[in-house]
């Protein structure tokens, strides 16, 4: 589609085009007037949007809308002031331009997971992880890893998990005494229960959290899924590796402050925590750099509690590059998928 990418928005420009509604609410200002408050996005990024005409009905979350607007600035952050808005009709837009997608094909990322399962010599872990992948089913191919922060994209959960798996392989060359099967198992299953925690459409847009997600969260649900997978595979729940894997799931946020009721208590659990944090943080910073010109600081990032600087990297263009479209995803170097564990699905 011939329109300006969100990542290249600047103050005072005018915009007319199609965007995807990630959030959409009608709110009431301090003076009692109604207005629309939305997050609109294309595949390169998102922007907060306001429409001060409170008589307009908010579009559904996940809908594609056509807007005529001006880019303004509020509290140091770009904001869209909408003059006109309507829901788009099918055929007016190219969805691949609007949906943030993982930069690699889902099938190739999934093959990295099954390859790791195929390499496992620990039969208990291989059976449990294989069963948990079966339980995740087709939704794993398109689910994001989060609603707004890291890997909030179509196939983001696979992107996050496969990237962590590659980090784990690198770590094992430095610390070969770690239990490879246990570390791989923890990486693969640690966030699978996000599928039960969030409601996502096939475009990878999270519309809400489930009752299960709000009452339990993916850490607690993840533990119950490990136990359920063990039960299905007729593995005693008091088997030590079942308990170790449950501990890795419930401790991978590191501290009670971040949701883990227990800190990591053995080396593979500790390593899982740091691999998870590094991959999430690097993904978030990469997204920030895409939105920030070289030589400039970003707006303050609330999740990091700081601004991020975009250095003048050698050979890099000043303008942030938009993410590749889903159908243009580059092929990712990975272990030979032909040896992947074939019995998972």
Where are these regions (language model features)?
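OB-fold nucleic-acid-binding modules
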Residues: 1-16
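Divalent metal-coordination and catalytic microenvironments
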Residues: 19, 62, 164, 249, ...
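OB-fold single-stranded nucleic acid-binding module
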Residues: 23-34, 46-50, 54-96
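Short, acidic/hydrophobic/Gly-rich beta-strand patch recurrent on exposed beta strands
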Residues: 37-42, 200
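Acidic/His-rich, divalent-metal-binding segments that scaffold phosphate/diphosphate chemistry
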Residues: 94-213, 234
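Divalent metal-dependent catalytic cores for phosphoryl transfer on phosphate-bearing substrates
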Residues: 149-150, 159, 170-294
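Acidic, low-complexity intrinsically disordered tails
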Residues: 311-345
């Amino acid at each position: 589609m011939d329109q300006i990418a969100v990542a290249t928005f600047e103050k005072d420009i005018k915009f007319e085009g199609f965007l995807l509604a990630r959030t959409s609410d009608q709110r009431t200002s301090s003076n009692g007037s109604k207005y629309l408050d939305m997050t609109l996005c294309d595949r390169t990024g998102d922007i907060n949007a306001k429409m001060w005409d409170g008589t307009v009905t908010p579009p559904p979350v996940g809908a594609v809308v056509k807007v005529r607007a001006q880019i303004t600035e509020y509290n140091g952050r770009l904001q869209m002031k909408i003059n006109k808005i309507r829901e788009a009709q099918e055929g007016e837009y190219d969805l691949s331009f609007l949906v943030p997608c993982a930069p690699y094909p889902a099938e190739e990322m999934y093959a990295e997971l099954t390859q790791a399962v195929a390499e496992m010599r620990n039969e208990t872990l291989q059976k449990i992880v294989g069963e948990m992948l079966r339980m995740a089913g087709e939704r794993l191919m398109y689910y994001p890893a989060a609603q707004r922060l890291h890997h909030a994209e179509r196939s983001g959960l696979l992107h996050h998990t496969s990237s962590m798996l590659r980090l784990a392989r690198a770590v094992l060359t430095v610390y070969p005494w770690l239990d490879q099967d246990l570390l791989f198992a923890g990486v693969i299953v640690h966030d699978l229960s996000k599928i039960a925690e969030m409601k996502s459409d096939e475009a990878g847009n999270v519309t809400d959290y489930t009752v299960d997600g709000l009452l339990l969260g993916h850490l607690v649900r993840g533990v119950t899924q490990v136990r359920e997978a063990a039960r299905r595979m007729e593995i005693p729940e008091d088997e030590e590796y079942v308990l170790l894997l449950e501990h890795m799931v419930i401790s991978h946020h590191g501290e009670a402050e971040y949701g883990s009721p227990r800190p990591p208590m053995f080396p593979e659990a500790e390593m899982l925590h740091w691999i998870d944090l590094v991959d999430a943080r690097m993904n978030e910073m990469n997204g920030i750099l895409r939105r920030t010109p070289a030589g400039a600081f970003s707006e303050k990032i609330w999740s990091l509690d700081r601004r991020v600087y975009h250095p003048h990297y050698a050979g890099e263009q000043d303008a942030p590059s938009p993410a590749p479209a889903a159908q243009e995803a580059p092929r990712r170097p990975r272990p030979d998928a032909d040896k992947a564990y074939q019995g998972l699905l």
